[in-house]
Regions:
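N-terminal catalytic or cofactor-binding beta/alpha core of small enzyme domains
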Residues: 1-120, 126-138, 142-154
Length: 155
């Protein structure tokens, strides 16, 4: 299944860069995995996923969970989604639902969001907090394993 991993985030806003850090580590560790990083969100995400059968979007979230907690959402399997703070204007799930209405033929059939609960997205800095760093490593390992096995497990 033709898959792309999209990391969303801002590298100078600490934990908000988690998705981009995942992509950077994938490029270094597993260059066979197609991946890209986006900073602006919405339209940039929709454009990056065109032509793929599966998209895995990794983003920092603020849902009230413990920092570093990893959550997985199969977008097609849910009509309701938890309220998740996004610093990118429109949250990722809403972006994908909008894409389905506008570009239904070009959207990947499988859409997975991996959210990493952020601790600090307001302070400026290029390093993530320690719990988010650990979560980034777990997500990278999971995506690499998925690329070998062809599936993705629940965290």
């Amino acid at each position: 299944m033709k898959t792309i991993v999209i990391g969303v985030g801002n590298l100078v806003r600490r934990d908000d860069g988690a998705g981009v850090h995942v992509v950077n580590r994938l490029k270094a560790r597993a260059p066979w995995i197609e991946s890209t990083a986006v900073a602006l969100g919405s339209l940039e995400i929709l454009e990056a996923m065109k032509g793929y059968e599966r998209v895995i979007i990794v983003d920092a979230v603020k849902s009230g969970a413990q920092p570093g907690e990893i959550m997985k959402v199969d977008v097609k399997a849910t009509n309701n989604h938890p309220s998740i703070y996004s610093s990118h204007g429109i949250d990722v799930i809403t972006t994908l639902k909008l894409g389905e209405k506008i570009f239904s033929e070009e959207m990947p059939k499988e859409q997975i969001i991996i959210g990493i609960e952020a601790d600090d997205v307001l302070e400026y800095g290029t390093n993530c907090t320690s719990r988010v760093e650990r979560a980034i490593d777990i997500v990278v390992n999971e995506i690499v394993s998925m690329s070998v096995s062809g599936g993705i497990s629940y965290f």
